[in-house]
Regions:
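Extended, charge-rich alpha-helical interface modules
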Residues: 1-81
Length: 81
């Protein structure tokens, strides 16, 4: 996946996240399934942003950016900022 594909995936995930959040704010149903989907979207976004950062760092330091890999949710969710 190249940077453009990662960014397209991020845009798609963000759009879905916004749609779900807007439905909740408008008083729409707030089911366990929707909350679970929001959590999945947040995790997938964290993974995508991490992948994009990896790719950009590899490129900056002259390494092959295509060697960047999606890391497990458990790993990216526990980063200290």
């Amino acid at each position: 996946m190249d940077d453009h594909q990662v960014l397209a995936q991020i845009s798609s995930l963000v759009a879905e996240e916004h749609e779900l959040r807007e439905q909740r704010q408008a008083g729409g149903p707030d089911s366990a399934d929707e909350r679970a989907r929001l959590a999945q979207l947040e995790q997938a976004l964290d993974q995508c942003w991490d992948l994009l950062r990896q790719r950009r760092a590899r490129k900056e330091f002259g390494q092959d950016e295509s060697d960047a890999m999606v890391r497990p949710v458990e790993e990216v969710e526990n980063y200290l900022q």
